[in-house]
Amino acid sequence: MHPAHLLVLLGVCVSLLGAARIPPLPLSLDDFSNLITCANRGSRSWLDYAHYGCFCGSGGSGTPVDDLDRCCQVHDNCFGDAEKLPACNYLFSGPYWNPYSYKCNEGEITCTDDNDECAAFICNCDRTAAICFAGATYNDENFMVTIKKKNICQ
């Protein structure tokens, strides 16, 4: 093996060792899934809401199919407001990737005081949505409704 190849191989190995020690970045989406579990006391996973109605999950359009879907519409609007805050205006990330601090105690969610302005705003958006989800009726027919009824969300 040529010495240049050994140098490249050594560089790759060192890079991989360094990368393995980098802890994963906590994300607002991870926090939101935990708040959902907290508010509904583990009765439903965040995955149950990922493709529900016209507004739960990525994007959103049309008219909400029910109260639960309306919770998602309000959450989308809240994040839209967060994106307009100077404190939440990040070049490549925005509020969806900003972690925040919170406490969960027997279904009660508290956004902690150590959050910066953007994290506090996002935490309150997610907290409000999680509580709304827990209080709304889940209709299995509205899960993946955009696939079942193609034109429902236009």
Curated annotation (Swiss-Prot):
Cofactor requirement:
Ca(2+)
What the record says about family reads: Belongs to the phospholipase A2 family. Group I subfamily. D49 sub-subfamily.
- Which GO cellular component terms are attached? extracellular region
- Broad class of enzyme this protein falls into: hydrolase
What role does it play? Snake venom phospholipase A2 (PLA2) that shows moderate enzymatic activity and exhibits procoagulant activity. PLA2 catalyzes the calcium-dependent hydrolysis of the 2-acyl groups in 3-sn-phosphoglycerides.
Query: Which residues does UniProt mark as catalytic?
Result: 75, 126
Q: What is its main location?
A: secreted
Name by which UniProt lists this protein: Acidic phospholipase A2 1
Checking InterPro entries in the record gives: PLipase_A2 (IPR001211), PLipase_A2_Asp_AS (IPR033112), PLipase_A2_dom (IPR016090), PLipase_A2_dom_sf (IPR036444), PLipase_A2_His_AS (IPR033113)
Which region is the signal sequence? Answer: 1-19
| Gene Ontology MF terms | calcium ion binding; calcium-dependent phospholipase A2 activity; phospholipid binding; signaling receptor binding; toxin activity
Its quaternary organisation is: Monomer.
Cell location: Secreted
Tissues and organs where the protein is expressed, per its UniProt entry = Expressed by the venom gland.
Name one process (GO BP) from the record.
positive regulation of fibroblast proliferation
- Reaction(s) catalysed (UniProt annotation): a 1,2-diacyl-sn-glycero-3-phosphocholine + H2O = a 1-acyl-sn-glycero-3-phosphocholine + a fatty acid + H(+)
- State the source organism's domain of life: Eukaryota
**E.C. number:** 3.1.1.4
Q: Which UniProt keywords apply?
A: Blood coagulation cascade activating toxin, Calcium, Disulfide bond, Hemostasis impairing toxin, Hydrolase, Lipid degradation, Lipid metabolism, Metal-binding, Secreted, Signal, Toxin
Disulfide bond entries? 38-104, 54-153, 56-72, 71-132, 78-125, 88-118, 111-123
Which residues does the record annotate as propeptide?
20-27
Where does this protein hold Ca(2+)?
55, 57, 59, 76
- What's noted on cofactor binding? Binds 1 Ca(2+) ion.
